[in-house]
Amino acid sequence: MTKYIYIALVGVVVVLFGALRYQSSVIDELEITTKQQEDTNKSLSLALQQERNDEIERIATENAESVKTIIKTQPCAHTRLPQSVLDRLHE
């Protein structure tokens, strides 16, 4: 009778060991997946930030060109500054 109890206990231990190994492998796979997702998120964040920076730079350039165009259309754009003002600006 005790022989069957020992066999049953060994069977339970083997099943528990198998379940433990399975759960361990699932956890390892989830950790790998999490790491891959973190890396992907970092690269996407960098790409998005670069895209935003490019858009800001493009808008700033457009605005600067627009201001230059407006200034060039004003009559004062072709007026010569007095030499004293030019000297002060060069300092």
UniProtKB/Swiss-Prot annotation:
Top-level division of the source organism's lineage: Bacteria
Cellular component aspect of the GO annotation: membrane
Bilayer-crossing regions: 7-23
Chief place where the protein resides: membrane
Membrane topology (UniProt): Single-pass membrane protein
Subcellular location: Membrane
InterPro entries membership: DUF2570 (IPR022538)
Assigned keywords, A-Z: Membrane, Transmembrane, Transmembrane helix
Record keyword Membrane present: yes
Record protein name field: Uncharacterized protein HI_1414
